[in-house]
Amino acid sequence: MECFEGIWQFVGVSRAAHAYLVRGTRRTILIDTGLPTSVAYLTDCLAGLGMTPADLDLVVLTHEHIDHAGAAPMFARSCPVAAHRLAARKIALRDEFTMMNKAFAADLENFEVDLLLEDGCRIEAGGVSLHVLHTPGHCSGAICLLEPGRRVLFSADTIMASGIVGGVLGSGNVADYIATLERLAILRIDHLMPGHGRISSNADDDIAVGLKRLHGLLDDSQALFATLRETGRGFDDMMRSLRELNNF
């Protein structure tokens, strides 16, 4: 589906994240790749636009979770892959816990991230500029990509329509997540291109709702620790629960 001129959404299937194609006058960029099983589907999506994976100039991963990075090894055979340095480190070390492999019952083939991104980097496609925002919270190496000309944010799992947040998993934490959404709240953003769910043109409202949910999550975690203290359960019980986080 073409969302804006030169921007297409490839809707994720079977729990895979959405992928987005950005086509400028000089470069064609794929944002996220879904699960390892998404290879054939994404190849078909490209074919529908008269393209093959070899026509891509760059793949950008918004973070290391396997539902976003799973098909990257196939695309890495013909074009460079970019990610935030923290995400790239987890991919290089095959950190299966933070990459959520077990949660998706999938394994990620070895591949290298070629380009390390930092906050403030710009990816120029020719007529389209993507500004890299480091947005930790959902995980430590998460990024969003801002296309300022049309006020479009490729928000991945950081913030989605109706204020849905992607959860605090693996390397994520609530405090960073709140700081990230506070930062996004002061930017000029109209449209969210999320990793899951529908596209939204109410970015300000979505971010505000997401912030409320995160503050609620912080309050809930404080209440949980208070309950553990009251019932005599300690840190070891909490750690046993955390070890199961990647096995649901």
Can you annotate each of these PLM segments?
Residues 29-31, 60, 81, 152-154, ...:
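Residue-level marker for buried hydrophobic side chains located in beta-strands
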Residues 49-54, 123-128, 148, 186-187:
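Glycine-rich phosphate-binding loop signature in dinucleotide/nucleotide-binding domains
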Residues 36-37, 129-223:
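Metallo-beta-lactamase
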Residues 224-248:
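C-terminal regulatory/interaction regions
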Residues 37-40, 44-122, 216-219:
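Active-site HxH/HxHxD metal-binding segment of metal-dependent hydrolases
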Residues 1-5, 21-23, 40, 57, ...:
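A structural signal for the main folded, soluble domain(s) of proteins
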Residues 1-49, 144-156:
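Conserved beta-strand hairpin/beta-sheet module of binuclear metal-dependent hydrolase folds
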Residues 1-8, 101-105, 126-128:
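Short Pro/Gly-enriched beta-strand edge/turn motifs at strand-loop
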